[in-house]
Amino acid sequence: MIKNRKLDITSTNVAGIGTDLDKKCRLDAASTEAQWKGVGQAPGLKIWRIENFKVVPVPESSYGKFYDGDSYIILHTFKEGNSLKHDIHFFLGTFTTQDEAGTAAYKTVELDDFLGGAPIQYRQCQSYESPSFLSLFPKYFILSGGVESGFNHVKPTEYKPRLLHISGDKNAKVAEVPLATSSLNSGDCFLLDAGLTIYQFNGSKSSPQEKNKAAEVARAIDAERKGLPKVEVFCETDSDIPAEFWKLLGGKGAIAAKHETAPTKSEKVLYKLSDASGSLKFSEVSRGKINKSSLKSEDVFIIDLGNEIYTWIGSKSSPNEKKTAFSHATQYLVNNKRCEYTPIVRVLENGTNQSFETLLSA
């Protein structure tokens, strides 16, 4: 069965503590998750997909390829000075199930504990990925389907055509979109993968980076099929676009204009979550430049950077402050009519790294 119900991120219990899902995960994990054995000991990437409440390793050959019906955990181990640091991302596809999303979040906490509680945790939602996440993958694909779809490999001659959308300059993204002329636009590049023929459509206002990325993806698909496909490249303004290209899209039609979005710089806002008074209170601390000295060990702080939300967990904060930090961050997005899929990052006081310090001072 192919999942097609969009994930309601606001109803996902990310902490999962005390729920039936929590119990299910604990039983499945037993005392130690076998997949965590030996991880985080050397620089590099490890990726797991959630399958029936279990974490299943993704082959390295498939790194950077994600399905919109699944949830994943990504561990990035890197050197900072003479020590190893860890970032843990849990990625939620648009059509992943609530159980898969909850399991990914729960297992992320488990992996964090296994690595000593110091890693920085990131919640990544499809189409709203952070630059730090996208930078991990030279090739980044979002494809339709998921573990319930079977992932059956088919021969090129039996291949069901699909349309891939390539957009963005610095960190170009590749995502599968509906196979229709209405999916095209002048500002981006597209690949129509028909099995033995791969059509590259370059929008009239697409960037050189997008064209290069599209060509790179076409070459990767061609190599995967041992050089059998023929690759045809053309621009929106060409007069000799193959008739078969339009036929596969349901017929020739008007191409949408390039979608321009003006860059916006949001004012940083620092909030404090504290129960020092006897009851849990969420209050604004400051706006504009945020000094690290404003972050106190006794409390939890939520930092709104516009395109990302950070929860900073003080080393002496109370159990209740720690437990509710994520839910306050998600509720903050809802209350302020912000996109609920905005990346949320969890940072422990003793687990901060240079990238976090840079964000504060920027």
Swiss-Prot record:
Record keywords, A-Z: Actin capping, Actin-binding, Calcium, Repeat
SMART domains associated with the record: GEL (SM00262)
Single GO MF descriptor: actin monomer binding
One GO term (biological process): actin filament bundle assembly
Top-level division of the source organism's lineage: Eukaryota
InterPro entries in alphabetical order: ADF-H/Gelsolin-like_dom_sf, Gelsolin-like_dom, Villin/Gelsolin
UniProt-annotated binding residues for a 1,2-diacyl-sn-glycero-3-phospho-(1D-myo-inositol-4,5-bisphosphate): 162-170
Gelsolin-like repeat boundaries on the chain: 53-102, 172-212, 280-323
GO cellular component, one term: actin cytoskeleton
Note: Severin changes its conformation upon binding of Ca(2+) and then interacts with F-actin.
Function: Severin blocks the ends of F-actin and causes the fragmentation and depolymerization of actin filaments in a Ca(2+) dependent manner.
Family affiliation: Belongs to the villin/gelsolin family.
Name of the protein: Severin
Phylogenetic lineage: Eukaryota, Amoebozoa, Evosea, Eumycetozoa, Dictyostelia
